[in-house]
């Protein structure tokens, strides 16, 4: 066996270190830079998705623009891409382009394994099914969303602050969409039960969902305790809370929605005149055109219709037209 002198052994080791480690050290800054760029791109895309969500009920065009911008800077982050597609699906639903909305939701399921965005996609599918009266498909999406919620709740302590905010939207939207579906198919008890699982304190970080919450209670059918007069007053109070929040947040969609619901409440006889007599301060707040009592409901419906046209929600615009027709019928016009 050949004996190697210690000094030669030291030189050999040094050559190995130079050949192996020095190239590695040269690459590390590049890798760190790529990771940094990836993080920066994700943060930028998250920012655009946050803006897309912010404009959900303010401007559909803005939501579309910011969601597309998020897609452009996503750099292959499947969670970011899934969120962007969900934002675009929301716009498609509002514009009643249900085939496009379903296509976008299906894309989320093939692109990402991000459980939160898959949950949001399931909830959007629930809304599509509700709008298209596809009952079996609704229940399929409803059950799938429930299973995802349970899985996410098992790891809720691991969610980032941004993911926690996203879950405030997902959890509340799940209950709101389900409640609306049960209400329209005549299951009033289930409708009230599913939405009672959350309270306003759960929505403190999401103004849009808090408005939605108060609107659901004010629109009718969920409140059952008390006399007819007491229930109508409670619903009116809920609608006014939603209206004030919508005005403060400049939420075009919710201003229009609350105006339409208030119009329908004021149309009712004898409840409408009683509401006007018992709530003079609130009536002054919504009667911006100083209309006489007999024409106020029609004025609210017209303003609602104008805002829905401006916003671009075809489904709700049809509802405002129906309410306005009832107003004309009421005054024999």
Regions found by a protein language model. Give the residues of each.
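A "functional boundary" signal
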Residues: 2, 8-12, 25, 36-333
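N-terminal Sec-pathway targeting helices
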Residues: 14-19
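Bacterial N-terminal signal peptides
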Residues: 20-33
């Amino acid at each position: 066996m050949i004996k190697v002198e210690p000094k030669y052994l030291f030189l050999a080791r040094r050559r190995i270190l130079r050949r192996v480690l020095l190239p590695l050290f040269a690459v590390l800054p590049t890798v760190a830079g790529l990771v940094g760029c990836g993080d920066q791109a994700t943060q930028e895309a998250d920012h655009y998705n946050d803006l897309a969500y912010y404009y959900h009920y303010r401007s559909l065009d803005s939501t579309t623009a910011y969601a597309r911008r998020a897609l452009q800077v996503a750099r292959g982050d499947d969670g970011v891409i899934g969120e962007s597609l969900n934002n675009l699906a929301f716009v498609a639903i509002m514009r009643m382009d249900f085939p496009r909305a379903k296509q976008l939701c299906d894309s989320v399921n093939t692109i990402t394994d991000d459980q939160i965005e898959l949950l949001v996609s399931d909830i959007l599918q629930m809304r599509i099914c509700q709008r298209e009266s596809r009952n079996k498909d609704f229940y399929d999406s409803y059950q799938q969303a429930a299973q995802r919620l349970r899985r996410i709740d098992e790891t809720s302590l691991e969610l980032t602050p941004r993911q926690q905010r996203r879950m405030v939207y997902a959890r509340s939207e799940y209950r709101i969409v389900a409640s609306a579906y049960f209400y329209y198919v005549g299951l009033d008890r289930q409708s009230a039960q599913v939405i009672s699982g959350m309270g306003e304190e759960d929505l403190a970080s999401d103004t849009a969902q808090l408005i939605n919450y108060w609107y659901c209670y004010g629109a009718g059918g969920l409140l059952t305790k008390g006399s007819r007069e007491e229930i109508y007053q409670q619903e009116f109070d809920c609608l006014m809370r939603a209206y004030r929040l919508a005005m403060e947040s400049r939420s075009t969609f919710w201003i229009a929605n609350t105006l339409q619901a208030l119009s329908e409440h004021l149309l009712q006889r004898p409840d409408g005149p009683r509401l006007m007599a018992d709530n003079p301060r609130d009536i002054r707040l919504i009667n911006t055109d100083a209309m006489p009592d007999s024409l106020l409901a029609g004025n609210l419906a017209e303003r609602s219709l104008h805002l829905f046209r401006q916003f671009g929600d075809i489904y709700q615009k049809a509802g405002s037209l129906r309410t306005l027709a009832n107003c004309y019928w009421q005054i024999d016009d």
